[in-house]
A protein has these predicted regions:
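The beta1-alpha1 cofactor-binding region of Rossmann-like NAD(H)/NADP(H)-dependent oxidoreductases
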Residues: 42-43, 63-74, 106
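Conserved glycine-rich Rossmann-like NAD(P)H-binding loop of the short-chain dehydrogenase/reductase
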Residues: 31-48
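Hydrophobic alpha-helical topogenic segments used for membrane insertion/localization
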Residues: 307-333
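SDR active-site lid
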Residues: 176-269
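Conserved glycine-rich cofactor-binding loop
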Residues: 10, 17-19
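Substrate-binding pocket helix/loop in short-chain dehydrogenase/reductase
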Residues: 100-101, 108-110, 316
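Active-site helix of classical SDR
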Residues: 124, 159
Length: 385
């Protein structure tokens, strides 16, 4: 399956005004993609679209809630009317709730599923309708919690499990029908976005994402890569792969670790803000890629480098291994040579000294005939090197 170069693509991005979606929109625009941007806040969309167009890019927007299938369908039609086609559809919009499952009202639980799951289902179905003849890519944003659930974000974990199941099933059906559509599930680890700030909170403290955090640029880079190269799934960050493997291969151990750290890992240390604004029902107008809290952020990932550039990474690792082997071998050779030279010098000095002592009568002639044994005894008695 051949996908267009990003500079020739028309890309639809949901959740385009915050976090991963915003970073992806800006990066894709810089790469030359034409964009149809979707989010709920029209003011933020207008500002972002103006920013991209004034910088030499090409973007239009459609304000809608992805849980509204009819409005989302209109977004797809707008992309066709503006650009003539769609090449990649990125289902990124999502939200979360912090709180124990039994403490969260059912209406809020349902709202997360409407956005995170039904938004992906609607978007994917619309995308298949547009892509089934000319081909293209559907990229759904899952999470490491698609494989490894996290307490206090139970409904978010459940929604991302649903996204994974839906995406995998849709991929199988599309491939069985022979449709030229690549379907990718992106599974990021903790990313430094306003995610905790925009989540509704039922905890007594302000939540945080457990570290280490990765830069949203890594997710955007992966999305753009998958828009050009068919990829089944893509973990973002080494920790995502680790958590997924642990949860699947040692589930009881994973559960125990989560039980022991249920509060500490997600507690920012700050008391909960009363009447804080969250994005569950109403969005804000900020264009914010990264979280407000000062956190250590990993700007790169060796795992991702290897995933995107496997041959280059293999070559670099092989080259590094050869270089290390050469350095170690050279040092061992120098050490061996140096030891031989020192032994020869010691033996020579010992023979000269013993000969001198023998002539002066200090030691016997028999002792003088064995300088090497005398020197060896000195080494093993602790008086040598």
């Amino acid at each position: 399956m051949k996908l267009r170069n990003i500079s020739e693509q028309v890309m639809v991005i949901t959740g385009a005004t915050s976090g991963i979606g915003l970073t992806t929109a800006r990066m894709a625009a810089d790469e030359g993609a034409q964009l149809l941007l979707i989010a709920r806040n029209e003011e933020a969309l207008r500002r972002l679209t103006d920013e991209i167009n004034q910088s030499g890019g090409r973007a239009v927007y459609h304000a809608c809630d992805v849980a509204d299938e009819g409005s989302l369908r209109q977004a797809g039609e707008k992309a066709i009317s503006e650009f003539g086609r769609i090449d990649t559809w990125v289902n990124n919009a999502g939200g979360s709730i912090y709180g124990r499952i039994m403490d969260v009202p059912v209406d809020d639980l349902r709202r997360v599923f409407e956005t995170n799951v039904w938004g992906v289902i609607y978007g994917s179905r619309i995308a298949v309708e547009h892509l089934r003849d000319r081909g293209g890519a559907i990229i759904n944003i899952g999470s490491e919690v698609s494989d490894a659930p996290v307490p206090l974000q139970g409904i978010y974990s459940a929604s991302k499990h649903a996204v994974k199941g839906f995406t995998d099933a849709l991929r199988i059906e599309v491939e069985a029908d022979g449709l030229p559509i690549s379907i990718t599930l992106i599974k990021p680890t903790a990313i430094h976005t306003p995610f905790p700030e925009n989540a509704k909170n039922y905890l007594p403290y302000e939540p945080q994402l457990p570290g280490p955090l990765y830069a949203p640029d890594l997710v955007a880079e992966a999305i753009i890569h998958c828009a050009q190269h068919p990829v089944r799934d893509f973990f973002i960050g080494e920790m995502a792969k680790l958590h997924s493997s642990l949860a699947m291969n040692a589930p009881r151990l994973y559960d125990t670790v989560q039980e022991k750290t249920i509060d500490s890992m997600q507690n920012s240390g700050e008391p909960s803000v009363i009447n804080r604004h969250d994005g569950l029902y109403s969005p804000n107008s900020r264009l914010q890629e990264r979280g407000s809290a000062e956190r250590f952020v990993l700007e790169d990932s060796l795992y991702q480098r290897a995933k995107i550039h496997p041959l280059i990474t293999a070559g670099l690792l092989a080259g590094s291994g050869i270089a290390i082997a050469a350095i170690v071998g050279s040092r061992m050779k120098r050490t061996s040579s140096g030891t031989d030279n020192r032994d020869e010098m010691r033996t020579g000095r010992a023979a000269e000294l013993n000969d001198r002592h023998a002539r002066s009568g200090e030691i016997s002639a028999a002792e003088a005939a064995e300088p090497t044994r005398a020197m060896s005894a000195t080494n093993f008695d602790g008086g040598g090197i």
